[in-house]
UniProtKB/Swiss-Prot annotation:
EC number(s) recorded for this UniProt protein: 3.6.4.13
Keywords: ATP-binding, Helicase, Hydrolase, mRNA processing, mRNA splicing, Nucleotide-binding, Nucleus, RNA-binding, Spliceosome
Keyword ATP-binding: yes
Localization of this protein: Nucleus
Taxonomic path: Eukaryota, Metazoa, Ecdysozoa, Nematoda, Chromadorea
Xref: SUPFAM superfamilies: P-loop containing nucleoside triphosphate hydrolases (SSF52540)
Gene Ontology MF: a single term: ATP binding
Reaction catalyzed: ATP + H2O = ADP + phosphate + H(+)
One GO CC term, this protein: transcription regulator complex
Positions of short motif DECD box: 192-195
Official protein name in the record: Spliceosome RNA helicase DDX39B homolog
UniProt motif Q motif: location: 41-69
Pfam family, one: DEAD
Keyword Nucleus recorded: yes
């Protein structure tokens, strides 16, 4: 793969030839079917290391979410876990806290491997590991993905071997095949957004090859917001008697506190309507999803010209540029982000309270992951979808049928208290 080429598995597949050279037992399966925003018990009840509790306190978290309450107590005992839960419900913290709690760092040994399907998500997960391990100075974290020079990764592994490695399957496999990344001491193996990796045949092959290089006795954990029944079966083949946690069944996988509306209009009317809505609505930060790179750039330019300063992120940017723009948006340097679907999964920006589907997503899965950028962790938010033709209408109907929800036409006036926390009209 050429270094400047920007691939992620959502858009196209990395080609292998271009790459350079304890298990818990018990039968504690659980299926949860109710939403609970927080539990009265706190993180202290999990008997975590004081250093981890201190970091959790710094993040402002007091009570575990439903998925954390269900997973963490069993996971910190070493049990394999397969978990489906709504976006924004704190799945990342489950495996980050769980692996840090159990980790006993040994110099020169990789103990934790965490893989996900996009580079941005890998970068974000590595930052979460750094955040929760800030009072564990002996713990070293590294992130490896394509689009960056592989030599730097090899030097890091040789000179300052991390205990925790986060990355995308393509780059991880290249490093493992070359012998630079040694996986024979791995104790904890995590797949985030596992449906993307297990559901994609090419990526699944990469994952399987990596798994074969790890010890048979290890803890395996897999997480996703969408996990069809047929994929659950495949996921469980990687595990030994896993605990299964499904927080809300698939038909009810809607986001608590998220208002969802559509606007029927012609293609040529989209820009004017978007500008009017940005004028009328109150927002902290907004993400606007489009279907193609050219549309992303054009809309970004239009918004800037109309005094709505924005940031654009798409797959044709250099990797450093993409990460830099992502961080700039996360740091609140601009309030509007225009993006293609590569930003649609797993990205966690706490201030986003409105998502626009300027272009209709391809399917109901993409819809869920896009609108989940608003209303993270059970907070309020607003999702507005533009419907401009018959195909758009069909997709919207399929979303409503699958998730058993009613997406209504956008009213002329919206009560600000329905989509911004702590506001009254």
């Amino acid at each position: 793969m050429e270094e400047e080429q920007l691939l992620d598995y959502e858009e196209e597949q990395e080609e292998i030839q271009d790459k350079q050279p304890e298990v818990g037992g018990g039968d504690a399966r659980k299926t949860k079917g109710t939403y609970a925003s927080i539990h009265s018990s706190g993180f202290r009840d999990f008997l975590l290391k004081p250093e981890i509790l201190r970091a959790i306190g710094d993040c402002g978290f007091e009570h575990p979410s439903e998925v954390q309450h269900e997973c963490i107590p069993q996971a910190i005992l070493g049990m394999d876990v397969v978990c489906q839960a709504k976006s924004g419900m704190g799945k990342t913290a489950v495996f980050v806290i769980t692996t840090l709690q159990q980790l006993e760092p040994v110099d020169g040994e990789v103990s934790v491997v965490c893989m996900c399907h996009t580079r941005e998500l890998a970068f974000q997960i590595s930052k979460e590991y750094e955040r929760f391990s800030k009072y564990l100075p002996g713990v070293k974290v590294a992130v490896f993905f394509g689009g960056m020079a592989i030599k730097k990764d090899e030097e890091r592994l040789a000179n300052d071997c991390p205990h925790i490695v986060v990355g995308t399957p393509g780059r991880m496999l290249a490093l493992a095949r070359s012998g630079k990344l040694k996986l024979d001491k791995v104790k904890y193996f995590v797949l985030d957004e596992c449906d993307k990796m297990i559901g994609d045949a090419d990526m699944r092959r990469d994952v399987q090859e990596i798994v074969k290089m790890t010890p048979q006795q290890k803890q395996v954990m897999m997480f996703s917001a969408t996990l069809p029944k047929e994929l659950r079966t495949v996921c469980k083949r990687f595990m030994q008697d896993p605990m299964e946690v499904y927080v809300d069944d698939e038909a009810k996988l809607t986001l608590h506190g998220l208002q969802q509306h559509y606007v029927k209009l012609k293609e040529a009317e989209k820009n004017r309507r978007l500008l009017n809505l940005l004028d009328a609505l109150e927002f902290n930060q907004v993400v606007i999803f489009v279907k193609a790179v050219k549309r992303c750039e054009a809309l970004h330019q239009l918004l800037t010209e109309q005094n709505f300063p924005s940031i654009a992120i798409h797959r044709q940017m250099a990797q450093e540029e993409r990460l830099s723009r992502y961080q700039a948006f996360k740091d609140f340097q601009k309030r509007i982000l225009v993006a293609t679907d590569l930003f649609g999964r797993g990205m966690d920006i706490e201030r986003v309270n409105i998502v626009f589907n300027y272009d209709m997503p391809e399917d109901s899965d993409s819809y869920l992951h896009r609108v989940a950028r608003a209303g993270r962790f059970g907070t309020k938010g607003l999702a507005i979808t533009f419907v401009s033709d018959e195909n758009d209408a069909k997709t919207l109907n399929s979303v409503q049928d699958r998730f058993d929800i009613s997406i209504t036409e956008l009213p002329e006036k919206i009560d600000v208290s329905t989509y911004i926390e702590g506001r009254t009209n």
